[in-house]
Amino acid sequence: MLSAQLDEYLAEMNLSATTEQKKQLVGFVEMLNKWNKAYNLTSIRDPQQMLIRHIMDSLAVSKHLVGERFIDVGTGPGLPGIPLAIMNPERSFVLLDSLGKRIRFQKQVQHELGIHNISSVESRVEAFEPEVKFDGVLSRAFASIEDMLHWCHHLPSETGCYYALKGQLADNEMANIPQGFEVTDIIELQVPRLDEQRHLLRVIKK
């Protein structure tokens, strides 16, 4: 059932995936559903809704990524980082979260599904100092762009940028962009079977 739905949604989004990638995406949903019963990793309980609201919602960003090295800040159970890593095996993703149970889940996913381009780190964002800066800083965890730029200012490389995954944009969201930053793109994302607004904001340091 999930496999058939995934095929349908990928076709709607014009995304191509190998048999192995599809197997990993479905496997991730199945593991998330299983672990969620004990670890409370997401408020969404229905695997079919997980596929839409977690997997496809994450993959809507995929074609907009530029660069090789990414960090997903406040990744939770690995969103959007794990679906993006599955679909972009040539890129590397650091998954950052401060809760140990989430990191344990991510590492089990990595082991069971054979995902080799992710690295899970248990840390608060302000305490994490990367040896090499990132081409892209991703997050769907922050309430505002302002918060994201404040807490993640030390993560991108000189040419790197921020990718903020948002729902409906607040009227004052753009007005509160701190000095020294510029919003280069506001992209309206289309997620199959999701009748809610989704946006991707790309921000750079001036």
UniProtKB/Swiss-Prot annotation:
Encoding gene, per UniProt annotation: rsmG
UniProt keyword annotation of Cytoplasm present: yes
Pfam families: GidB (PF02527)
Enzyme class, broadest EC rank: transferase
GO molecular function, one term: rRNA (guanine-N7-)-methyltransferase activity
Known EC number: 2.1.1.170
SUPFAM superfamilies: S-adenosyl-L-methionine-dependent methyltransferases (SSF53335)
Binding positions for S-adenosyl-L-methionine per the UniProt entry: 74, 79, 125-126, 140
Highest taxon, organism lineage: Bacteria
UniProt KW S-adenosyl-L-methionine keyword: yes
Matching InterPro entries: rRNA_ssu_MeTfrase_G, SAM-dependent_MTases_sf
Gene3D superfamilies assigned to the protein according to its UniProt record, in alphabetical order: Vaccinia Virus protein VP39
A GO cellular component annotation in the UniProt record: cytosol
Organism encoding this protein: Shewanella woodyi (strain ATCC 51908 / MS32)
Protein name according to UniProt: Ribosomal RNA small subunit methyltransferase G
Lineage, highest ranks first: Bacteria, Pseudomonadati, Pseudomonadota, Gammaproteobacteria, Alteromonadales
Keywords, alphabetical: Cytoplasm, Methyltransferase, rRNA processing, S-adenosyl-L-methionine, Transferase
Catalysis performed (reactions): guanosine(527) in 16S rRNA + S-adenosyl-L-methionine = N(7)-methylguanosine(527) in 16S rRNA + S-adenosyl-L-homocysteine
Subcellular location: Cytoplasm
Broad class of the protein's primary localization: cytoplasm
Function, as annotated: Specifically methylates the N7 position of guanine in position 527 of 16S rRNA.
Family in the record: Belongs to the methyltransferase superfamily. RNA methyltransferase RsmG family.
